[in-house]
Amino acid sequence: MTEQQKYWFAARTRDKQEFTVRKSLDRLKSEEHLELDYYLPTRFVISQLKYRRKRSEVPVIRNLVFVHSTKQTACDISNIYNVPLFYMKDLSTHSMLVVPNKQMEDFMFVMDLNPDGVSLDSEILTVGHKVKVIKGELSGIVGEVAIEANKTYVVIRIKDLLTASVKVPKSYLKIIG
């Protein structure tokens, strides 16, 4: 890892503290002028209270935030600025888990497009052919094929962390390897 290059790091938060961490990271960006970005996938849910409905924002993945910064800045966020983040470890290298840029871009694109239509699984799905989506809104996304209940899904994997699957017609896919 080079010192000045930015990486995506996967970090855990305490239970129900995702929005507090987001607020702290926003404050560090604006007041402390730290060179960092973050990604917290959220969606809106309408809950029925006694006599009214309430629209609230909830995280798609509980207790998980992605931080884009240099390794030193990522360490400073929790050690110096006391933001309650716990970086996940890569089990093979025993260092902080780094998510590749392409995987992160694909994941953010799919989550921003339709967070309700995405199913997230932390366990590994059926291993299939590597494919690229060539038509539609998801054009350019690279993933693997999974078939569940006779429907075709493209599975996007973030190594050692999670998988996201999106329903895609078979005619939109091209096998790449």
Language-model regions: role of each:
Residues 2-127, 146, 155-177:
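Acidic-enriched and Gly/Ser
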Residues 140-148:
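Short beta-strand-centered aromatic/proline hotspots
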Residues 152:
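Glycine-centered loop/turn positions within well-structured domains
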